[in-house]
Amino acid sequence: MPVVVIGRFKADVAMFLGVVQTRAADFEAVAAEAKTQGALHHRFVAGPGEVLIIDEWESAEAFESFFSSQPVIPQIMAESGVEGPPEFSFYSPLASPDVF
């Protein structure tokens, strides 16, 4: 059953956006690899002092395996000034008639 993954990264949002621009090809390559390992949806969102990922994966195990073995993500995190390890939460999607 798919899971929604929320990841919180303490980071300077402007610095992160700069890395998105300078390493766009790396972001695209990581996304392509993620799709082969079970990623269904992905996006970044930001708030004051933090960047979040909102993903949907085939399973929590698929996400954890991908994230722990992906060599480019730690480089991007370091260049983005991420402070400390990210925090991940996993949620089960609920079926309801108002989903869109």
Feature locations, PLM:
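Short S/T/G/P-rich N-terminal loop/turn motif that feeds into the first structured element of a domain
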Residues: 1-71, 82-100
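Helix-adjacent hinge/juxtasegments
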Residues: 74-78
